[in-house]
From Swiss-Prot:
Its main location: cytoplasm. It holds the Pfam family EPSP_synthase. It is found in: Cytoplasm. This is UDP-N-acetylglucosamine 1-carboxyvinyltransferase. Belongs to the EPSP synthase family. MurA subfamily. The active site is at C126. HAMAP family: MurA. Gene3D superfamilies: Enolpyruvate transferase domain (3.65.10.10). GO terms for cellular component: cytoplasm. Cell wall formation. Adds enolpyruvyl to UDP-N-acetylglucosamine. The lineage of its organism: Bacteria, Pseudomonadati, Pseudomonadota, Alphaproteobacteria, Hyphomicrobiales.
Length: 431
């Protein structure tokens, strides 16, 4: 099993190209099930979750072709994938595939919309708490679907097709919004989704579906209205830049020090995060094709900042672990409150192994900043926790080995290469 070795103490300097967003790419890929025509997606990242979803879609009969240079001289991904679901081979999504990634459950929406039936295993993925599958099933019931749980599978049927409905999400859910949006595109009549997620990744999906012939209004708001259509067509669209990856590398610079240009990062998707990082002392400059981040070598103090995660545009839960790593070196005490997932502090124990002092009280972590961290062997517990350990290790004295980095490969494209290009002493160790 691979691990990552980091020797801390090196400043970062250079350019880091920001990849296409995994959280945007996955629902766009799943949307290919909605049409018999070809859906072409540009800027698809090379990630384990993407490759797994390709296998899942292929199981349903979706053909695909890859073109474009893998990486240019600057390390920028130019991969384009053409997906064609001319015929749906099966409406069954098996446990052996779905158990590996929760987002694979989202196929239930398009399969039900197009084939009037879906038989999908209950999902897997990172073990970071309850995810709102129930909201999805309740929404599909509102659309007229019959739902049964059988031997660990959800069997959904709508023999006469789905019907538009008014549905209020009990809690904001990005995945639930994705699924019900896709399901509603071909439902008969009008659908209104209230308390919907308005993340940039949701907007990317809405624009894709509209380009395919859907009629969705309310983009960027919490109320979405969908007028059902009979058929969707193919289109070509670009996956947005990964705001979580951009925020992660900005925090790495804040932690290790240095001067880095985050190429292709979209500052409009990071407004709250950038404001928080500026409060910590990071210098940020918005440029036409990205974000320039710098920690002034004459002022190396990291200021403590309290944050609370929340639905967009609040501070994203997917950057909570990375920010906690940064706060371990702050000059003072920071409080981090997690409101999205109830079990997303599994990285605390491992950060403490590096010399951090973090105490938990329910959904709030109190981080007591330390002058120094010490390298140690640590173990990744989930995707975002794994990269928080890398960030901490960049500033720790000595060597850190991060084990179980298969979590990292699910969501970060060539992380060790991107950091090494900027001067970090980091390498992958293959067992």
């Amino acid at each position: 099993m691979d691990s990552i070795q980091i020797v801390g103490g090196e400043k970062l300097k250079g350019t880091i190209p920001i990849s296409g967003a995994k959280n945007a790419a996955l629902p766009l890929m799943i949307a290919a099930l909605l049409t018999e025509e070809t859906l072409t997606l540009e800027n698809i990242p090379h990630l384990a979750d993407v490759e797994l979803l390709i296998r899942i879609l292929n199981n349903h009969g979706v053909g695909y072709a890859v073109d474009g240079q893998e990486f240019d001289d600057d390390g920028v991904n130019s991969r384009t994938i053409h997906f064609t679901a001319q015929k749906i081979a099966t409406t069954r999504a098996p446990y052996e595939l779905v158990k590996k990634m929760r987002a694979s459950f989202w196929v239930i929406g398009p399969l039900l919309a197009r084939c009037f039936e879906a038989y999908v295993s209950l999902p897997g993925g990172c073990a970071i708490g309850t995810r709102p599958v129930d909201f999805i099933l309740e929404g599909l019931k509102a659309f007229g679907a019959h739902i049964a749980i059988e031997n660990g599978y959800v069997h959904a049927k709508a023999p006469k097709g789905l019907k538009g409905a008014h549905y209020h999400f009990p809690k904001v859910t990005v995945g639930g919004t994705h699924v019900l949006l896709m399901a509603a595109t071909m439902a008969k009549g009008t659908t209104v989704l209230e308390n919907a997620a308005c993340e940039p990744e949701v907007t990317n999906l809405i624009r894709t579906l509209n380009a395919m012939g859907a009629q969705i209004t309310g983009e960027g708001t919490t109320t979405l209205t969908i007028e059902g259509v009979k058929k969707l067509q193919g289109t070509r669209i670009r996956v947005i830049a990964d705001r979580i990856e951009a925020g992660t590398y900005a925090m790495a610079v804040a932690m290790a020090g240095g001067d880095v240009f985050l190429k292709n990062a979209n500052p409009n998707h990071l407004t709250t995060v950038l404001k928080v990082l500026q409060k910590t002392g990071l210098e940020i400059q918005i440029e036409p094709h990205g974000i320039h981040v710098k920690r002034n070598p004459r002022n190396t103090t990291i200021m403590p900042v309290d944050i609370k995660t929340g639905p967009y545009p609040a501070f994203p839960t997917d950057l909570q672990a990375q920010f906690m790593a940064l706060m371990t070196r702050a000059e003072g005490v920071a409080h981090i409150t997690e409101t999205i997932f109830e079990n997303r502090f599994m990285h605390v124990q491992e950060l403490n192994r590096l010399g951090a002092e973090i105490k938990l009280d329910g959904q709030t972590a109190t981080v007591y900043g330390k002058e120094k961290l010490q390298g140690a062997p640590v173990m990744a517990t989930d995707l975002r926790a794994s990269v928080s350990l890398v960030i901490a290790a960049l500033a720790a004295k000595g060597e850190t080995i991060v084990n179980r980095v298969y979590h990292l490969d699910r969501g970060f494209e060539r992380l060790e290469e991107k950091l090494a290009r900027c001067g970090a002493k980091i390498q992958r160790l293959t067992a």
